């Protein structure tokens, strides 16, 4: 499938399914997050990790692949900025984002691998769960583009996913066995959603931390930390209120805080911070 066709498929899914509200403030895309009370504190604290790495105050924050800015913690990233620039491939996402932040935002339909902005115009850039929807050939260009549009010395902060990382592989074995026991027919929209969920149809392959550092380090400094070390499948399968679910997640969060680079490398979702290389000029 050509790159343009892959991007069109992603746009179609989010315009027609993913960013359609199924109830007040809850989107169809909520299937990709664990919104149960037992997981809420852990999820919210992970969302808040982004804010540690962006500039606390600035003029312009770019939210690349903003979606509808669907979680309260996401809204807080731009609290001390004059404007939040929301860029997304989905017009539905941007309409929902406008409903949430109004005049605080500017809204642009665009491709994060070809940002329509001049060099060095943003005080910080954030991008959550967007790069993995791109064709694989666009992954490194997307990182470079987000670095390009930040001001010198300012951070771009991205959350993405690894390809079957060790911790997920270890913990998910029982769940995957159970899933293989299940059968059922899917309609067309469910098939598209499944492709996006499993990372098929949106790129040819994923990668690991070593590969990403190798590809990016020639252009910029890269720090890989933990955003969240377990995925939604793990949370829904293992975490139960009556089996000390909250306590287990508090323990997991504490370990992530103690060893952020370890869990960022072996866990599900890394928090990737890129900035200018020290003592060097941009290419």
Regions found by a protein language model. Give the residues of each.
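Conserved class I S-adenosyl-L-methionine
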Residues: 1-54, 70-74, 155-184
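Class I SAM-dependent methyltransferase SAM/SAH-binding core
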Residues: 62, 67-114
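A conserved beta-strand element that flanks and buttresses the S-adenosyl-L-methionine
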Residues: 126
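Short catalytic micro-motifs in class I SAM-dependent methyltransferases
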Residues: 129-130
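A short glycine-rich, Lys/Arg-flanked "PGG" loop and its adjoining helix->strand segment in the class I
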Residues: 140-152
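Acceptor-substrate binding/catalytic loop of class I
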Residues: 195-210
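A C-terminal cap/extension of S-adenosyl-L-methionine-dependent methyltransferases
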Residues: 210, 214, 224-283
